[in-house]
Amino acid sequence: MELKNKKILVVGLAKTGVAVARFLAKAGAFVTVTDMREEEALADVLAELSDLDITYELGRHVPYSFLMADLIVVSPGVPMDIKPLEMARSQKRRVVSEVELASWFIKAPMVAITGTNGKTTTTTLTGEIFKACGFETFVGGNIGNPLIELAESGQEVARVVVELSSFQLEGVESFRPDVAVLLNITEDHLDRYHSFQEYIDAKLRIFENQTADDFAVLNIDDPLVAACASKLKAQLFPMSRLHELEEGISYRDGFITFSHKGKVLRFGTEGFKLKGVHNLDNIMASLASTLLMRCDGDCAYEAVKSFKGLPHRMELVEEIDGVAYYEDSKGTNVGSVVKSLESFDSGITLIAGGKDKGGSYEPLAPLVESRVSHLVLIGEAKARMQQALGSLTDTHEAQTLEEAVEIARRLTKPGGVVLFSPACSSFDMFKNYEERAERFKAAVRAGKKGEA
């Protein structure tokens, strides 16, 4: 689509909206930005765009602007079913996401990665493998830099790796990755979607425009993911920790085996720095994606062995008096916490809770009963979590994260583990999951110094 002199409305002025507005203005479009927040709340953001010719409609959405736009670009934080967007679609206005817009201007081969959990680790590792194998690579999307920033820069890269949330996938039309990865599907964002199926359908849009020339990497150990296989137009490339595969990538007895069209590569996992059962899935997805896109096996293996993982994902903070403290603030849904609990056999003190996302906590029940010695609950969700899990183990409530850490310190015996994996978002008590993580680390370290 030619952007020059087109009337384009950008809905939402967070990080992605800023990047989109900047790109469109520089491309010569007539840009209007609308956001329900008032000007005072957006002062810093507006300063970033002050040198560009942009019209702002703040504190409200003006229906006329939605109806007159040649194109509407919606930021991921804005639900697609708000009334102005529904009205615009009913009048045949074109409504897309930032990822869709960016894809029109990016020609490099692309790996796109989605799933409820593990996206960021898999995306980062995939990018690291490409770079180690000599491919200049852009890594972005839901992690770090919006994809539109690559389009704006004009930088020529050999590979693109993009992490995609369900929100970003809602607004795709022609977006088509060469390799699309679906890691897993568990209940999440039910505070945004009307049903679990609606959330699943958003995830599956990653495959919508693929053809037989493309690959779909599916974790077939997840029944909801495996059920998608029959709907694919792309070539299925399965991954599994539970089954050996003649075609695909699988794990057995300490080795990952990649098999594709008669080519077989085996990778021993003993030297991997990235620990945890769930990370085997992330590693297999990263290896599959990069090896399918012409990375050298030895080079890819060395990159995996040197990868230490990311902050806020099962990060060992300290070992104090024989107790290991793990920070897993990115564990914002039940499925993620299940994976984290599976990494330990027993003796866990679990700190959980935060802003409730509307899903069921029942999938945690078997692991809480069998592996969690003490459960400490915080935040808005603690009443619901108490009801679902409180009778299964020794359970306590705390008013602050610092109090929760102190309770955990008192209860956990040497040789045990304190795991902070909330199963909830952070917005009831913190600005974001990063701030929540730093508060946990500070509380743990304060105890080490005898300050708590």
From Swiss-Prot:
Amino-acid positions noted as binding ATP in the UniProt annotation, renumbered to this chain: 115-121
What superkingdom heads the lineage?
A: Bacteria
**Which EC numbers does the record give?**
6.3.2.9
Q: Which pathway features in its UniProt record? A: Cell wall biogenesis; peptidoglycan biosynthesis
Q: Name one GO molecular function term.
A: ATP binding
Question: What does the entry give for GO biological process?
Answer: cell division; cell wall organization; peptidoglycan biosynthetic process; regulation of cell shape
Question: Which keywords does this Swiss-Prot/TrEMBL entry list?
Answer: ATP-binding, Cell cycle, Cell division, Cell shape, Cell wall biogenesis/degradation, Cytoplasm, Ligase, Nucleotide-binding, Peptidoglycan synthesis
State the Pfam families in the record.
Mur_ligase_C (PF02875), Mur_ligase_M (PF08245), MurD-like_N (PF21799)
Alphabetized Gene3D superfamilies for the sequence: Mur ligase, C-terminal domain, Mur-like, catalytic domain, NAD(P)-binding Rossmann-like Domain
Q: Mind telling me which GO cellular component terms the entry cites?
A: cytoplasm
Location comes to:
Cytoplasm
Question: Do you know which HAMAP family this protein is assigned to?
Answer: MurD
Function of this protein? Cell wall formation. Catalyzes the addition of glutamate to the nucleotide precursor UDP-N-acetylmuramoyl-L-alanine (UMA).
Record's family? Belongs to the MurCDEF family.
Protein name stated in the entry: UDP-N-acetylmuramoylalanine--D-glutamate ligase
Source organism:
Geobacter sp. (strain M21)
